[in-house]
Structure formats: C-alpha cells, structure tokens
Design a protein with these regions (language model features):
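Arg/Lys-rich, positively charged N-terminal/basic patches that mediate binding to nucleic acids
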Residues: 1-27
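Enriched for short, Lys/Arg-rich terminal
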Residues: 2-4, 56-89
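Tryptophan-centered motif/residue detector
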Residues: 10, 28, 52, 74-76
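Active-site micro-motifs of SAM-dependent methyltransferase domains
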Residues: 11, 30, 82
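Hydrophobic residues in alpha-helical membrane-spanning segments
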Residues: 18, 36-39, 63
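A short, surface-exposed loop/turn module that caps and links secondary-structure elements
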Residues: 29-54
C-alpha cells in the first residue's frame, strides 16, 4: 500500500489546530497498519466509488481516493459539518 496527500490536503492539514494534527497522525498510523481498523470507521462514499472517508476524531474526517494498485491519495480533511457539505450523499 502506498499513500500520499495532495497539495490541497497538505494545506488543510497544516491549517488544523495542533490537537487535530496529532489526532490525524494517530489515525494515519492506524490506517497504515490496518486500513480496516474499527476505530477509523472506513466508509466508501456513494458519490464516488473510489472515495473513502476515515474518522480522525468524533468531529473530524479525512477523505482519500483508492486506486487499483492499492494506492491511496488523501484529498481532504476537515470537520464533519464541512464533510457533509463537501461530500453530500
């Protein structure tokens, strides 16, 4: 498995408060060890069959695109409220 963030993802990550950055790093560690870790609540988005979201905290999610070679490209991170606006079902 490979994984990387887009420039937009990296900008959004850098804008997060430090406690959310720490939570995002912890979530990514779990993801890199086991993408199906129950704490991540990995979910496929109905709007795009390549798009998946993971739970960072109770109020924060991250979105990645998954490709056939098991490459993940992180495209978005933010609040659940913003997630619902950006990725309506």
């Amino acid at each position: 498995m490979t994984s990387r963030g887009t420039p937009d993802f990296c900008l959004a990550y850098r804008a997060l408060p430090s406690e959310l950055k720490l939570a995002a790093r912890r979530a990514y560690q779990k993801f890199s060890e086991n993408p199906a870790h129950p704490g991540l609540r990995l979910e496929r988005l109905r709007s795009n069959p390549r798009a998946w979201s993971v739970r960072v905290t109770q109020n924060c999610r991250a979105v990645a695109l998954r490709f056939e070679d098991d490459a993940w490209v992180w495209i978005w991170i933010g609040s659940h409220q913003d997630f619902d606006r950006e990725f309506p079902e």
